[in-house]
Amino acid sequence: MTTLTARPEAITFDPQQTALIVVDMQNAYATPGGYLDLAGFDVSTTRPVIANIQTAVTAARAAGMLIIWFQNGWDEQYVEAGGPGSPNFHKSNALKTMRKQPQLQGKLLAKGSWDYQLVDELVPQPGDIVLPKPRYSGFFNTPLDSILRSRGIRHLVFTGIATNVCVESTLRDGFFLEYFGVVLEDATHQAGPEFAQKAALFNIETFFGWVSDVETFCDALSSTSFARIA
């Protein structure tokens, strides 16, 4: 068992029953010229987040934790995004940006596109699981819950972008499904102003989970090495 110093209190977990979740570390969300950047969101401070996720993934993999990578997006025709009858059609900033700038149609969050791809620095390895998701929450219309339950996983450690959208949405849904969620705050980044990051972390540590950081996470895992049993 590993005890992780966190807010509002420490949390103890078995790395063999824990997954590291990497949320949407795609060019769309972390790279200049990607969807968030084109939609007017600041992505200039995402590089340290990428480096911190690399560190967290390395430590988690060495401890035998399952690594799950999410990619948010839809088919090239955007059928999966939903039409005017879906609130996603009206609220997705990617879809709204493409309607405002028709030359971007088919380029934002479309499967197979550069925008959809994970950033170059973050490469899934054999044994990792890569899951597409069509909405903010990684539990909606994906096999995530089945994958976790079949492996006896109850604790989820979250990294990725955006803290206040897909990270928080997935952690909240996990809370409702009886998963224990931890966010590594310096391995996440908000979509929007800095107060959005602070508000999301406040919500998580107060109502839905725990908040820690990458150095503390790595230190907690470093005392013992683990080997995942297939």
Curated annotation (Swiss-Prot):
InterPro entries: Isochorismatase-like_dom, Isochorismatase-like_hydrls, Isochorismatase-like_sf, RutB
Name the record gives this protein: Ureidoacrylate amidohydrolase RutB
Highest taxon listed in the record's lineage: Bacteria
Family membership noted in the UniProt record: Belongs to the isochorismatase family. RutB subfamily.
Catalytic activity reported: (Z)-3-ureidoacrylate + H2O + H(+) = (Z)-3-aminoacrylate + NH4(+) + CO2; (Z)-3-ureidoacrylate + H2O = (Z)-3-aminoacrylate + carbamate + H(+); (Z)-2-methylureidoacrylate + H2O + H(+) = (Z)-2-methylaminoacrylate + NH4(+) + CO2
Induction description: Up-regulated by the nitrogen regulatory protein C (NtrC also called GlnG) and repressed by RutR.
Disulfide bonding pattern of the chain: none
Annotated catalytic residues: 24, 133, 166
Gene3D superfamilies from the UniProt entry: Isochorismatase-like
SUPFAM superfamilies: Isochorismatase-like hydrolases (SSF52499)
PANTHER family: ISOCHORISMATASE-LIKE DOMAIN-CONTAINING PROTEIN, PEROXYUREIDOACRYLATE/UREIDOACRYLATE AMIDOHYDROLASE-RELATED
GO BP, sorted A to Z: nitrogen utilization; uracil catabolic process
NCBIfam families, per database record: RutB
EC supergroup of this enzyme: hydrolase
UniProt keywords, alphabetically: Hydrolase
